Structure formats: C-alpha cells, structure tokens
Amino acid sequence: STDYRIETGDHDFVYGLPELNRRKICAANHVANPGCFATCIQLGVLPLAKHLMLNSELHVNAITGSTGAGVKPSGTSHFSWRNDNISIYKPFGHQHLAEIKQSLTSLQNSFRSEINFIPVRGNFSRGIFTTTYLDCKVGLDEIKRIYEEYYADHSFTFITDKNPDLKQVVNTNKCLIHLEKHNDKLLIISMIDNLLKGASGQAVHNMNLMFNLEEKVGLHLKPSAF
C-alpha cells in the first residue's frame, strides 16, 4: 500500500528503505514498506543524490515479473497472456514516482529533474531489472568509489564490475548494481527480486532493525540453481 509512504505530517510512519533511513527505522513505531519498483530504482541512484550529482533528467526503464501485479488475478497476469509477451503500462505516471522523488529530494534538496519512467511487464514470474541513465561528467572510477562507499555498511546491496543478470538475485534479498560510462552518459543497471528485496524480504529487514536484531536474521537466502 502507498498510504503511508509519503510524508504528509499526519502520521508517524517512517519510509522503510534501510539503505536510506536505517537509523530512523531502528527508532520507529511504524514503518511503511517501499514499493518494489521504487526500491530497485532508488538503490540505483541514492549515492548520486547524496553527492548532489542528480542534475539532469533520469531515464528509467524497468521490467518486472508477473508477480509484481499482486495476487489478484487479472488479464495481464494470466499465464496464457503473459507467456512470450511484453508490454508497457503507466508510462511516465507510475504511482511509485512520488516516493522516489521524496527520497531523492531528502538527500539532494536541489533535485528538480524529471524522472522519465517506463514500466514494462515481462514474461517471467519474479524479479525487476532496471536500467537508468543520466548526464554525468564524473569519471567511472570515482563513481564506483562513491557507490562502494555509500553501500559499504549495508548488507544486501552490492556493486559488481561484471554485467549481471536477473537470475543472480531471484530468491534472494540482494540488489546488484552495475555501472557504465558512455561518453557523458552514466548507465546504472540495478536488479532485485520483487517478492523479497522488493517486498517481504525488506519487511523482515525492517522488522529486524525495529526489534534490534541482527539485520540479516532470516534473510540468509541462496539463489536457486538454474
């Protein structure tokens, strides 16, 4: 539910993205779990926001499995429609954009850029694979250093030099991030399992923080063998 993800001043829910609000979550009475798309997209760009580097439009394409639609049956989640098929939905107007903008602005007060987000329905059951690109003149080595530094004390987000694929995160609570520079464009590839890091795994992570448990309790998950 998106009901308590946006700070409106009339509730005490903390936005439950540990890589952004770990300390606040530890002291919270109520936590609002982020959206799955919002989680994957934000993890790809939070380090840039912290260093005030989001100064151009963000172009985001993210493809999600059929379980991203929830448990309620629909025409676009039915196997016979989803199999060997692909389509976009809610282009430029997805409901997760509000929480993404809220988080980025909390780190970079000057952030006013457009987020051009195209969500895509994929022909697989679980996982989110996101590509984000933006203008950035900073060199790749420095960008990698910024990302490694930001996620150094976080247990589930990893920077990889190898071009990753979705099966490396399915059935885990991990997020993998891969960075590339193409002239003055920075390409960010991020991926999660929408049912774990994008939903129940993140809820368990938040619960562990709220109850002062080791944050990886119950989340030592291994990917399936493919």
Where are these regions (language model features)?
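C-terminal helical cap and adjacent loop that interface with cofactors, partners, or active-site loops
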Residues: 167-226
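Short glycine- and Lys/Arg-enriched binding-loop motifs that mark or flank ligand-binding interfaces
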Residues: 12, 34, 61, 123, ...
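N-terminal Rossmann-like NAD(P) cofactor-binding subdomain of oxidoreductases
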Residues: 1-84, 89, 110, 178-182, ...
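PAPS/PAP-binding and catalytic site of the sulfotransferase fold
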Residues: 31, 146, 203
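Short, well-ordered alpha-helices that flank and scaffold nucleotide-derived cofactor binding pockets
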Residues: 46, 50, 102, 205, ...
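C-terminal substrate-binding/catalytic lobe of Rossmann-fold NAD(P)-dependent oxidoreductases
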Residues: 57, 62, 66-190
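Conserved active-site and cofactor/substrate-binding residues in soluble primary-metabolism enzymes
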Residues: 12, 36-43, 91-99, 142, ...
